[in-house]
Amino acid sequence: MNKRAINFVLTMLFVVLVGFWIYTSVRDEFLKQSRASQRRTVETVAAGYPSGDDEVTEWLKRLAEDSNEYRVAFVPEIPMPGEKLTAAPKGDPELAKLTEESAATPEFSKGFDNAAYEEIYRTSRNWTVGTHEEQAIFFAPAVDLKTHDVEGALVFAFSTEGEQGFMRMLNTLFFGAFVLFAVVVWQLMMSRDPIVGFALAGLFLMTLTFVAYPLFEALRLSFLENGKFSLGIWKTILNSEGYLSALWGSLKLGCWTATFSTLVGFLFAFVVSRTNAPCKKLISTMGVLPVISPPFSLTLSIILLFGNNGLFTRWLRVIGLDFTIYGLPGLVLVQTMGMFPIAFLTLSGVLQAIDSTFEEASLNLSAGRFQTFSKITLPLAVPGLLSAWLLVFTTSLADFANPLLLAGDLKVLSLESYIEVTGMNRLGHGAALSILLLLPTLTAFLAQRFWVAKKSYVTVTGKPSGRITELTTPCVRRFLTGIIFVIVFFLILLYGTIFAGCFVKNWGIDYTFSLENITEALTRSTDALMDTVTLAAIATPIAGIVAMIAALLIVRRKFHGKRLLEMLLMTPFALPGTLLGISYILAFNHAPIILVGTAAIIVINYVIRELPVGIEGGIASLRQIDPSIEEAATDLGADQATVFKSIVLPLVRPAFLSSLSYTFVRSMTAVSAVIFLISAKWYHITVLIYNFSENLRFGLASVLSTVLIIIVFGAFGVMRLLVRENSNLMKNVT
């Protein structure tokens, strides 16, 4: 009981700290937006100040009649600091009286001084105007439109009733949420299995707040026209041949990319994990390189090499080959090269966790190597294969950066959605097209679950083999390694183009060697680089731990709403970045949760967006672990936290590492959703790279892409050192 009480207190202290951070972020952002709106009103009204005493009097009278939002008083002669007024103010009587009485105070003196220098000033505290509530006071210069001289000062008073009402609602909301949360946590901790109940409550709260609610806002927007409910947007989309063609184009692209990426990813994972092939470190490095680079860097490299004026395209034309990289073939190529690491990272953990005693038994019973592979190894890898295919498929559907540059005549929904949002400024159409992408994603999701649920894939039983069995002959191993080296050479060629761009003065125009790009790029990107690393470092451990907890609950626990929770957790991966960005802007730019413009909304976006990768990897690994291991630990008195920390997490270590790695690199290289969520205070390096590329500053873009790759590779090394190898799972090829 004492231990549970201590855990409860510690949990609530953590909740208080996190809640206070969220509370202050919401409060400060609301006040910032409110005061910015008031300042814009002051600027607009002050810009209309007329010339002549009669005109000023009439203008003040008109303002008093037309506006209930603010009061205005005019001070004809600006006093010196600390002195009283020499002329009576005009305008609102109560505000004029306050101005006359308070003119010599430090706050009003500072306001008059700012007005004299043609600047707008807001007092640091609110003032009581007449018998009304406290109001916010602004000072602005009264500039004659003809002479452009400052004729006096304008004093504005804004009601703070709205701000105070919002603060009361915010305080009530947070206090009520805290009390409710405390009661729920207490009940869960005092229950028989409190940790599981608490985890389920947290996951449901997280998905409802940051998945269901934003999607509802986006869905609601797709049914609105001119502020009223309408089916017009959906009728236009479903009756448009162009939009339906884009849907078919997305499906074709997704299927081809997912198939080729899964094959390439499995080839890399199998050679690295299950053979004694040479250069494994090089293969592993090249196997993750594409996923850690900006999503458009490979596309730019391919265009520079194989575009209409590419280096290789010119050579092909010399020998009479008419070749174009634009369209479906080019997109499949660039997406496969960019997305096969998703399959590689997922399948590596699965193949490493397969207990090789089954393969040894098969070989001892005179089965051939290929028969053992096809009957034992491959079926046991099916969960990982399906998970990898699903993840790549949804990634391909949601991709817009590559189609933006390489689509050619091919229409895809993600690109059409992006164009609707950024080019046509039709948020409803963009949201509707993005929502349409959920149909094929959910279909693939349900098909995968239905297939996998009918099979058993338990291989880790608590007595793992200390080695793995070589299933390939030397000839086959050389053949597989040869294919990989061809792919590796192609990737090196692509990234060599990026590296070469760092030292070229202006790619495509002036190929003179220069170091100016490096100096300029690093100087202009310091703040954005620090912001990106900070936000990614915060999101990575959160996403990794939450993913493993969610996977454990989905695989090991039975509870009401399990399928709903699983669907909500997996949905973000299917969403185009534009939809996720739009959804978050729509959902979190007003009460009760205002996060737009803060670092929190970017971190939350990272966690929610990349969570499905870790969950899929965790599910695939947990299906290979015999539940009796955890049951034995529980029978010996271990609680759920100990079981998770000491038993489950070490056994799913490969999947956990993959989740951490993938979250960090995707956070560092995100662009589609982040481009909507960045602010002047929190910028992102990939957006800066994209801006440089868009402005044809390929040298600067190449430098930042190279720096980004170096940072992420360094993070990979640190992550490997922090999470040590589990000696029980170490395997050596024999």
Residue ranges and their predicted role:
Residues 136-148, 290, 572:
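A short, hydrophobic, proline-anchored segment that marks a local hinge/packing element in signaling
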Residues 195-227, 240-352, 380-400, 432-449, ...:
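Membrane-water interface segments at the C-terminal ends of transmembrane alpha-helices
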Residues 1-25, 175-177, 182-186:
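Extreme N-terminal signal-anchor transmembrane helix of membrane signaling/transducer proteins, especially
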Residues 57, 85-133:
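Extracytoplasmic/periplasmic sensor domains and loops in membrane signaling proteins
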Residues 21-55, 59-66, 158:
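Membrane-proximal extracytoplasmic alpha-helices
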